[in-house]
Amino acid sequence: MTDILDEIIAHKRLEIEQQKAAISQELLINNCNEPMPRRSMRASLSASPSGIIAEFKRRSPSKGWIKENAQADIIPPAYEMAGASVLSILTDENFFGGNLKDIRAARPQVSLPILRKDFIIDEYQLYQACIVGADAVLLIAAALRNCLLYTSPSPRDRSVS
């Protein structure tokens, strides 16, 4: 892993520990038993002439702030009107300025499938994605070594791709 990826993953582990202390995984699982209808990323990309995955991101570690007060209920509909097939929403707060609330804000405003883009290292995050309405999650291979996802149930079991 790169130095920045190591730093992000270390921070993500602490963040997830704090989240688990506030909201148990059992509670997330119970609230994910009746997930909202999912939108197929594969079907959307296959049917699209562009195949564009548009990304909602406020900042990046390398570039700094892109648009600090970008609103997830306003920008994603513009991406859809411009022809995007899928919407990728960064939910990492510390390094990218995102939040799970961004998926909740965008979902009712668009008909596109939504990809939760984050550093997924624990099945807890899959249940979070299910609850907020993500249709898929991004898995970064370099971040998956020695993580808890290897023992997780299939994402299809929870209706998240």
Label each PLM-derived region with a short phrase.
Residues 129:
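"…together with the soluble PPM/PP2C metallo-phosphatase catalytic core" -> "…together
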Residues 90, 115-117, 140:
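Structural motif
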Residues 110, 132-133:
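Short, structured coil segments at secondary-structure junctions
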Residues 93-106, 122-126, 142-149:
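Active-site-adjacent beta->alpha loops and helix N-cap segments on the catalytic face
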Residues 150-157:
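Conserved small/polar residues in nucleotide/adenosyl-binding loops
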Residues 109-116, 152:
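Short beta-strand/loop segments at the ligand-binding rim of alpha/beta enzyme cores
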Residues 1-112:
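Conserved N-terminal beta1-alpha1 strand-loop-helix module at the mouth
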